[in-house]
């Protein structure tokens, strides 16, 4: 549809509160033409994101087998309400007849026996002859790519400067780095993966891994790119240098996401529609499965890679799995679906915490890690999408669907707000690696990327952008560095910023975090 869906899935497209369509309108539609009217409306309002053939672009595929659990009237009502969790707008300007015609069309039969094999992938490779353009990066830890969604561009920033921009159709986010910070890999919803050299400032090969892509990941040695696909349902392994396919692993289910471990040659993934936990050996590409309690839709790995924190799409229970034996060690009921992809982490007063926004709920929740417990529900005045923090700031930074940036004190959870741009929606904060700079997206067609001082909120730079969304700093987007960030606060709070530091009462996580931080000082 006219606004791109972000971090969505096939089933998530239709999971918000519904409003009834009156019975009279429903009966009226029964007597009217179905497919052609629906097709015309679909092409007008939906095909931009879901493709004219309904195979998905930025939005997911809309195929009968993926929508079979929903009847036409339910789908129509869900389209009417929009999906704030994916930034899809409401279509309440359409009348009940039009909404039902769209729903009927996307439920209609289509040739959905799609395939995308090794030869298709090889044939899709695109090479570029971009001019050599060394970016002269001063500090790789400050690198920050930006996704300008409707501009179909990726920016490369360092501190307050834009070093380069390159074009990529249907870019949506989920950028991954090699651990030497020499290359990034950028996926698109319609299945492409673009390699870009941060050393030479050039686009390298681009390849289409599948028709509709969920996410990408890299092996810890940087040699392999893994693309999880919704259409077809498969996992594609690409050579990270040439981008040629190595192998395709068929998946019998709708994959949620795949995340690599930095501590071992393994990646982990779940399915939205099957109670399975998949483990991929990132060297041999063998896959093993463990049966779990229920399907997992959203999840993340804790910063020390000992636990998986996840929830099913119905979103009424948060579950923590111990990855040593794949057993549940903590469960807690919730009132609204958390957006765990958008969780943030910090250390304070002897405890590790994470916070997450909740879909269509005006609050975030705060949770204690390792001594697993629910801590706090914090009202933010609207349903937000992201909450972020960094050791340099005393606040959690959250959006709430308006022009407000909500600042939540990490000590007492008191809130205050600032307005980056009056009347224009703010979304998503990212920080520079050292935390000195905060980058804000003004989520508008005539939007901006604003760079501010993290401590005093002074605006330092602003750049025009067409629907800017995700931003991906090298340090803050790599789980390997999370313990180091915890170590900054541990050094301040428990070592009083002086050495030697008595660590005799530290737990294993505190010791690792402090050691990782002290190593950077050396």
PLM regions with names:
Residues 21-41, 132-133:
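Electrostatic cytochrome c docking/interface patches
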Residues 32, 48, 53-58, 62-111:
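Extracytoplasmic electron-transfer domains, predominantly the class I c-type cytochrome c fold
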Residues 124, 161-167, 202-207, 244-250, ...:
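A short beta-strand motif characteristic of beta-propeller blades
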Residues 125-134, 171-177, 212-220, 253-260, ...:
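Repeated scaffold domains used in trafficking and secretory/extracellular systems
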Residues 141-142, 180-182, 221-223, 263-266, ...:
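Short coil/turn segments that connect the beta-strands within blades of beta-propeller domains
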Residues 158-161, 197-201, 239-243, 281-285, ...:
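Short loop/turn segments that connect beta-strands within beta-propeller blades
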Residues 212-223, 228-236, 240-276, 285, ...:
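Asp-box/WD-like beta-propeller blade repeats and closely related beta-sheet repeat scaffolds
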Residues 442-522:
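Blade-level signature of beta-propeller repeat domains, shared across WD40, Kelch, NHL, RCC1
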């Amino acid at each position: 549809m006219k606004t791109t869906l972000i971090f969505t899935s096939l089933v998530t497209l239709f999971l918000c509160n519904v409003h009834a369509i009156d019975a009279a309108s429903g009966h009226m539609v029964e007597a009217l033409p179905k497919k052609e009217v629906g097709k015309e409306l679909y092409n007008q309002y939906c095909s931009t994101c879901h493709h004219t053939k309904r195979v998905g672009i930025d939005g997911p595929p809309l195929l009968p087998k993926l929508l079979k659990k929903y009847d036409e009237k339910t789908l129509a009502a869900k389209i009417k309400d929009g999906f704030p969790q994916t930034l899809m707008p409401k279509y309440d300007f359409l009348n009940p007849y039009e909404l039902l015609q769209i729903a009927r069309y996307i439920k209609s039969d289509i040739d959905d026996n799609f395939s995308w094999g090794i030869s298709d992938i090889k044939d899709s490779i695109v090479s570029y002859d971009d001019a050599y353009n060394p970016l002269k990066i001063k500090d790789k830890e400050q690198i920050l790519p930006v996704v300008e969604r409707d501009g179909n561009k990726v920016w490369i920033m360092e501190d307050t400067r834009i070093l380069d921009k390159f074009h990529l159709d249907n870019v949506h986010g989920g950028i991954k780095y090699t651990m030497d910070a020499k290359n990034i890999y950028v996926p698109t919803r319609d299945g492409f993966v673009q390699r870009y050299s941060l050393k030479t400032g050039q686009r390298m090969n681009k390849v289409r891994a599948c028709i509709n892509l969920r996410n990408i990941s890299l092996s810890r040695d940087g040699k392999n790119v893994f693309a999880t696909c919704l259409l077809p349902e498969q996992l594609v392994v690409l050579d990270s240098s040439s981008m040629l396919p190595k192998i395709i692993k068929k998946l019998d289910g709708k994959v949620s996401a795949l995340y690599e471990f930095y501590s071992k040659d393994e990646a982990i993934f779940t399915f939205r529609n099957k109670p399975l936990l998949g483990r991929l050996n990132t060297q041999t590409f063998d896959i093993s499965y463990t049966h779990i309690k229920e399907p997992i839709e959203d999840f993340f790995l804790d910063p020390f890679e000992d636990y998986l924190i996840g929830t099913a799409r119905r979103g009424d229970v948060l579950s923590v799995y111990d990855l040593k034996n794949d057993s549940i060690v903590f469960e807690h009921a919730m009132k609204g679906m958390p957006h765990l992809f958008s969780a943030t982490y910090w250390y304070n007063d002897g405890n590790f915490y994470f916070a997450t926004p909740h879909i269509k709920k005006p609050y975030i929740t705060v949770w204690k890690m390792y001594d697993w417990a629910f801590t706090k529900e914090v009202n933010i005045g609207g349903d937000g999408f992201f909450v972020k923090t960094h050791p340099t700031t005393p606040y959690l930074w959250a959006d709430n669907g308006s022009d407000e940036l909500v600042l939540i004190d990490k000590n007492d959870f008191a809130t205050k707000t600032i307005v980056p741009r009056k009347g224009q929606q703010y979304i998503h904060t990212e920080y520079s690696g050292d935390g000195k700079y905060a980058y804000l997206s003004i989520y508008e067609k005539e939007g901006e990327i604003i760079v501010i001082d993290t401590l005093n909120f002074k605006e330092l730079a602003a750049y025009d952008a067409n629907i800017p969304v995700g931003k991906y700093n090298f340090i803050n987007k790599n789980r390997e560095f999370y313990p180091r960030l915890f170590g900054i606060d541990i050094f301040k709070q428990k070592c009083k910023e002086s050495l030697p530091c008595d660590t005799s009462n530290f737990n294993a996580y505190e010791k690792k975090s402090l050691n990782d931080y002290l190593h950077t000082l050396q």
